[in-house]
Each structure stands twice: as structure tokens, then as C-alpha cells.
A protein has these predicted regions:
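Residue-level preference for non-acidic, small/hydrophobic
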Residues: 108, 239-244
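Transmembrane and membrane-interface helices of multi-pass
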Residues: 1-189
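Solvent-exposed soluble domains appended to multi-pass membrane proteins
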Residues: 225-234, 244, 249-515
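Secondary-structure junction/capping motif
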Residues: 33, 98, 177-202, 249, ...
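Short secondary-structure junctions and interdomain/linker hinges
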Residues: 68, 88, 115-119, 209, ...
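Membrane-interface segments at or immediately adjacent to transmembrane helices
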Residues: 168-241
Length: 515
């Protein structure tokens, strides 16, 4: 009892120490290393102190309740669970846990069985249930602060602490101890700490109004557009975009030894048609953002860190895009995806992007043709693309999103007689993942050949842009790649009417205008 009284007297000091210790544990979990957490703390002490102060400020809520032990445990669990979520995610992908991921919970639940065994999902549910029961018991039976709570002092002091923390945030931004622009979100989390970065991705969303935005400025811009040459009324080709899931050239990985070229068709097309590197906004995940840039011509740099427009602003409003522009030129616009219509909310998002039709796996005759991982094979897309082209007499814009190359990739040998063998990965498990992945993209490459062969004989002019949406979820680093860049794949612009070849590296948001 005497110890309890002493702890109450120095509780603020204990909160400070506990916040610092707790934050250190959080970073150790997120970085998968106590040594890395120690290096971060000693090399960036001001950032560490700021994030510890963040946790300390959030813990001050306990002084408004008698059940202080319960609230301390609850706050601790809140931060600890967030750290565990991030730590687990970083075992499976390169990008850390962000605010927009909270909007993807329903999508995550749908594909959880592809990343976790059923027993794992059940175990998580059981542990969560036990935790809730223990918290309820602590709330009802736990220790209780016996003295009267002085709200007239506690509330103003807590508000003062929040105000001081807000002021320190602004000061840290001005002094560049922190930054609210994340060029690479994975590196930002390492540099600025998990609590700050997570909060930034939750609250810093959308596009800020430009400083010089006004009616006068818009009229000035309109005047500069009046002397542009009129659009020529000539024959317009069909425009096809094919976004290949996690597709890239695995021979760019330094340590892999691959028995044969897994993407001979794509490589041949790159030599014969316009091609180059394709800069994308994400790595290991984030298909929808590469898709957004390619469709709208807008860079994700203008949005909040880690934001998914598909899960934010596009739920509420329309957006200028290639489909809308092309519809004004007489095109009919189609979207095709061999996965569920609701994944990333596409069923409700695509109308806001200007698509006239959307064909998802539920409406495909061959939806049961799946790979060992449970994803619909890409070869089913050939017929669906041709159906879109045949459905109208005029020109068509068809944006197709493939899914076959999606993770997670099995770390066990599940291909009995793989067409292509892989060696050189650091562990047997990683080698199994790469071998599975390489054989999947080889099948995707065969699909590319089938599609281009069919389109070569199509009676109308066709331009087909093909590219990977991001690198696969393999934990790749810059040092692992010959091209030394994680945020790029490759593209090829194929056609059946003799366009001049042009080699150029492009960003995803530039491609629609380039076509």
C-alpha cells in the first residue's frame, strides 16, 4: 500500500519514463530489432523525444478517471497493438501501416486467408476475445484511485499539455526535425518515428488549395488555351491499358539464378515497340494508386502520405480523368478486372472516374480458372477485352487490371514440376517464394502473347499499354536490384498500325497524356 501511495505521488515522472520505454519497445517491434531501435534513439534523439512525448500526452487521459490502472493498461495496449500490426505488416510488405489502411479493413478481411492459415485467423480471434474479457474484469475489479479527482485542475493542465505538444509539433516542422512530406513513406517511418508518421497519414489527407488559386488566375490560364490548334477529326484508335499485377523483370534481382527467361514475350515487345521504365507511387502494395495515376494523370505526391483516393475523395465526387476526356471525343470507356468488384471499392469508384462499364470476375465465364494461390488467372482477360472492343462500333478505351501475380507467395514448394526453376535466394523459404512468383509471371507473359496475337489481327487500330503496377512483396531493397530503384517497373506501348518506336522513361501519371 505504501508503494502504491509513492507511485501515485510520482505518477507523472513514471508516465514519462514508461512512455519513453514503451516507445522504445514499439520501435523495436516495428524495426524487428532492439539494436535498430537503439541506433534510432541515439542517432535521432529529438525525434525519439518527440514521439515519446506524443505517447505521454495521450496517456494523460488517465487522470480523468478513478480506474487509472485500467486506463493505463488500455492506452499501453492501444500503442502496443498498433506496433504489432505494423511489425507484422512489414514482414509481408515494404510499406508500413498507414491511416488509409484503416479504410482497407474490409478488403483485408476478404484476402486474409491468402496470407494467414485458418488456424491463425481463429487464434487471433480467440486472443482478441480473451483480451476483451480481461479488460472488462480489470475495469470492474481493478484498483481504483480513492481520492477525489480535481477536474478543475486536471482538465486545464491536460489541455495545456496538449497545446504545448501541438506547439512543439509546429516548431519541429519549422526546424525540420520533422517533415510532413514523405517522398518515400517507408524511409519516413524510419526517420520520423511510427507514432508521428501514423498520425500524419491519418489526418493529413487530400490536396491543399494552391496559393495562387483564384477566379482571376483560372481566367488567365483559359486565355492561354484559346490559340491552341483544333483537334483533328481523324480516325481514332482503340486505347487499351493493361495493368499487370506485381509484374516486373526478376532478372534485375542481383542474387537470383533463373533457369530461363520468364518474360520472353514482354522483353521482345520492349525491343520492338516504345518502352522504358515506369515510375510508380508504391512498392510491394498499393495497386489502386498506380491505377489512379495512370487513369487520371494526377501524381500521388499531391495527396497526403500513404493516402488512397479510392478510399477517400473518390467515394464522394467525380474526378477529371482519361475516360472523361475520351468520352468527349466519342470513345466508350470500359474497366475490366479479374477480381471482386468491391475490392478497393472499384464498383462505386469507377463510375466516378468516367467508366461506362465495369466487368469484374463475378461476370466472367471462366472465373473458376485460378492459380494455386486462389487468384483468377490472367488468361481469362483476353476474351473479356475483345468483348469490350466488339460491343461498340466506335473507338473504345479499355482499362484492364490483372490479378494473377498477387501475393502472398507460398514459402513451401507447391509447384510439383515447375517450368522454370529458381535458386540463389538467401533461404529455402525465400527461394520457394521466388520460384512460385517467377512461374506465375511466366504464365502472365504467355497471356500477353495470346492477347497481342489476337489484337494483331483485329480489324480496328489498337494501342495497348502494358506495365507492372509495383514490385512484388518480396522485401526487396535498393541493393538487391541492378537498376537500384524500388519505385519502378517497365512498360511497353504495343500497336497494330505501325507507330514509331520511342524509348522513354515515364511516370504513371504521365502515361495517359503520352498515349
Amino acid at each position: 500500500m505504501k508503494l502504491y501511495k509513492i507511485c501515485n505521488k510520482i505518477s507523472l515522472l513514471l508516465h514519462v519514463l514508461a512512455s519513453a520505454a514503451g516507445y522504445f519497445v514499439m520501435e523495436a517491434i516495428c524495426r524487428h530489432s532492439f539494436i535498430e531501435a537503439w541506433n534510432y534513439m541515439t542517432q535521432r534523439p529529438l525525434v525519439f523525444a518527440y514521439n515519446a512525448a506524443f505517447i505521454f500526452t495521450s496517456s494523460l487521459i488517465v487522470y480523468l478517471f478513478h480506474r487509472r490502472v485500467f486506463w493505463r493498461v488500455l492506452v499501453t495496449l492501444f500503442w502496443l497493438i498498433l506496433a504489432i500490426i505494423n511489425g507484422v505488416l512489414l514482414l509481408n510488405r515494404v510499406t508500413p501501416f498507414t491511416g488509409p489502411d484503416l479504410h482497407l479493413i474490409t478488403d483485408a478481411m476478404k484476402i486474409a486467408n491468402k496470407y494467414l492459415p485458418v488456424a491463425g485467423v481463429v487464434a487471433v480471434c480467440i486472443l482478441f476475445g480473451i483480451l476483451v474479457i480481461l479488460l472488462l474484469m480489470l475495469l470492474i475489479k481493478g484498483p481504483k484511485y480513492q481520492k477525489k479527482i480535481k477536474y478543475r485542475y486536471n482538465i486545464p493542465l491536460i489541455l495545456l499539455a496538449v497545446a504545448l505538444f501541438a506547439g512543439s509539433t509546429q516548431l519541429a516542422l519549422e526546424k525540420r526535425v520533422l517533415s510532413n512530406y514523405f517522398g518515400n513513406i517507408a524511409f519516413a517511418y524510419e526517420d520520423y518515428g511510427y507514432p508521428y508518421c501514423l498520425a500524419t497519414t491519418i489526418f493529413n489527407t487530400g490536396i491543399s488549395c494552391p496559393r495562387d488559386y483564384s477566379e482571376k488566375e483560372i481566367k488567365r490560364i483559359e486565355k492561354t488555351e484559346k490559340n491552341l490548334p483544333e483537334t483533328q477529326e481523324e480516325k481514332r484508335p482503340n486505347i487499351l491499358f493493361l495493368q499487370l499485377e506485381s509484374f516486373f523483370d526478376p532478372t534485375l534481382v542481383n542474387y537470383l539464378d533463373i533457369s530461363e527467361d520468364p518474360i520472353p514475350t514482354f522483353r521482345k515487345l520492349m525491343k520492338e515497340y516504345s518502352s522504358g521504365y515506369y515510375k510508380v507511387p508504391s512498392v510491394g502494395a498499393g495497386t489502386a494508386n498506380t491505377e489512379f495515376e495512370s487513369i487520371t494523370g494526377m501524381s500521388m505526391h499531391y495527396f497526403g502520405p500513404g493516402e488512397y483516393p479510392y478510399k477517400s475523395i473518390l467515394r464522394e465526387t467525380t474526378c477529371e480523368s482519361a475516360p472523361y476526356v475520351l468520352k468527349n471525343l466519342g470513345y466508350t470507356t470500359h474497366a475490366v478486372h479479374n477480381n471482386e468488384a468491391n475490392f478497393y471499392g472499384r464498383r462505386s469508384i469507377f463510375p466516378n472516374l468516367g467508366f461506362d462499364t465495369f466487368t469484374s470476375e463475378e461476370y466472367m465465364a471462366r472465373e473458376n480458372e485460378k492459380n494455386p494461390n486462389g487468384w483468377v488467372k490472367d488468361e481469362v482477360l483476353t476474351d473479356e477485352i475483345l468483348k469490350c472492343l466488339d460491343s461498340t462500333e466506335g473507338p473504345d478505351y479499355v482499362y484492364t487490371i490483372s490479378v494473377q501475380g498477387h501475393g502472398a507467395y507460398p514459402d513451401e514448394q507447391i509447384l510439383e514440376d515447375p517450368e522454370i526453376t529458381v535458386s540463389g535466394a538467401p533461404t529455402e523459404e525465400e527461394n520457394n517464394k521466388w520460384e512460385y512468383y517467377v512461374n506465375e509471371i511466366h504464365e502472365m507473359d504467355n497471356f500477353v502473347k495470346e492477347l497481342t496475337d489476337k489484337l494483331a489481327d483485329y480489324p480496328e487500330d489498337v494501342v495497348l499499354v502494358m506495365y507492372g503496377d509495383h514490385l512484388p512483396t518480396m522485401g526487396l531493397t535498393v541493393e538487391d536490384l541492378k537498376n537500384k530503384y524500388l519505385f519502378q517497373t517497365e512498360y511497353v506501348m504495343w500497336d497494330n498500325f505501325g507507330l514509331k518506336k520511342k524509348n522513354e522513361n515515364l511516370a504513371a501519371y504521365q502515361m495517359a497524356a503520352e498515349v
